[in-house]
């Protein structure tokens, strides 16, 4: 399968399941309402009790003045601080859980559409896929988070080592220290970008492994890494999709940004544009997922099924070697009767007598 065929198949899959884009838009609306209810109301109560003028929030000078002495502020309004922090944590938990649930259902519908393209979209099927795929995807997300934390820790160690080398070089020559600082920074940035892109690609292909093979988190990630190592063109396909997603999302956000500079009216006008921008980003994200699922299915699942079916045809019995009747005249002729045996000895004796 070529890149163009995979991308075309991904767009075709999502265009036939446009309800998934509507689910993404509904998720954004629910998140906005949830932020207002869970976080906005406690913050409003806190601002009123703190004596903060809500009309001056655009300048943010009152907020900086309020938090100029954080220890005194926390000691004076401890219960309000705890309430606001708890509200933010609850909101993050709510948004993460709901987003993961919707993503599980969307990934399940996309994978099911690849297995059975004729199956139509239904809300019942969406919730069924979300229920089946939620916990495997949750544990997979937790595992990937640990991987990113480990990578960040390793890069932190390398950054500290580079800082120590540059500091030691400053004592000898400032020009050498400047050169080493720029050189190591560029190398570290290039390695970090390449490694993070590879990890993200393995993560997305791991979701495909998680759906089609129903493996565990570690096995899914490991098989995705092996798949990308054996078929490196799959990595370049995801790189192309990732860059396309970034470019289109940037232009979609750039269209709505100038309206923020217009007072009052700009905020009203920019909100529908932001909604459209979010819908476009959600649509492109689903297309990227569908392309990855399709490419992995065609190269790994479908090809392995074809390979396992070939030996069955190779060992088929030869028709000439089977025990079937022949139609040749020689084989269909009657079997000759055995020649008559000689007379028995007893009969010869009677005839002589």
Language-model features and meaning:
Residues 4-9, 15, 25-34, 39-75, ...:
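Juxtamembrane transition segments at transmembrane-helix termini in multipass membrane proteins
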Residues 24-25, 88, 141-142, 238-239:
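Residue-level recognition of transmembrane alpha-helices
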